[in-house]
Amino acid sequence: MRTLKFLTVIFLLTISSNNLFGQGACACCTDNHTSFDFWVGDWIVFDTSGNKIGENRIEKLEGNCLINEHWTGLKGSTGCSYNYYEPSDSTWNQLWVDNQGSNLILKSRAESNKMILKSKFQKSPNGNLYTNRITWTLNTDGSVTQRWDIADENDQLLSVAFIGIYRKK
């Protein structure tokens, strides 16, 4: 009887420890968690005229719970972003930091073959509100277009800060 109780306790501890230490199913392999996977890979980035402007390595880390970006521009700019899905509010989130002292915090929801992330509204030097709206679109040829728009409080386009076309290395 004692042996049966002991074996039962060992069995339950084994199951519990597998769940506690991540040995069970992939927690971040849901459709929501993988909706930005089209961006994962090693890329050469071009401007709209076809000129190479940099390279970007996008990889999944932390048991597929984090997408990590490593940007290297031809003119010396570098930057990293951390991207993750937040189940509590069903949003994607990005934190971007670069070697020029800039940072962005973006948030929104994924669409089919597209990710549109926005910053909170900020005040320009002249006092007008604006937001950063960055869209990544999976193209039919497997490339990805990243477009960074500056929009006003009515979501109307003020300017385009960046357009990059990602092609796999």
What do these predicted ranges mean?
Residues 1-25:
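Bacterial Sec-dependent N-terminal signal peptides
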